[in-house]
Amino acid sequence: MAKKVFYDEDARARVLAGAKILYNAVKTTMGPKGRNVVIGKSYGGPSVTHDGVTVAKSIDIDEADDETLGFKVGAELIKQAANKMNDVAGDGTTTVTVLTYHILNEANKLIAAGHNPMLLRKGLERAASEIIKELGKLADDIRGDKKRIAEVATISAGDEAIGKLIADVMEKIGPNGVVTVEEGRGLELESEVEIGRAHV
């Protein structure tokens, strides 16, 4: 199949349109009061989730005609940001999706108005550095505070029992331990602590 190449405003508009499709689906899961999303599957029944990265991964944009060509690129940019956040922190994927979309949208407006894209990039990098410093000042160190860990885990999981279990496990493994969550086969929550295992 012959490749189609798009330039300038047309290319940016197509990328932004694809990013917006993914953004609109994921943004509803934002925060502890975010709504659930039902995901249809080609096999089995639908699944219900409150997790932004799960919603993002489930979206596959079909570039069926000339109108939708390039949309997939925009959606993949947002997915890439959400996946990276998930790999680094295991949470915050919806926030990253919302921020990434709005940065793309505003950058598109500025570029269309004649601003230099490379200078915009440098400005974003400087702003990100300052934001990270400020967030560091605002952050609370909750290491060793079982009650606060349980609160954060409860909000993240949306379930008090899971939050308490995570706090119990964190207390056992300490600040340098690694927590891995897997879907169980039974009906009860359970934990297992393995001492002395390390990945090098």
Q: Where are the regions a protein language model picked out?
A:
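Conserved small/polar residues in nucleotide/adenosyl-binding loops
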Residues: A198-V200
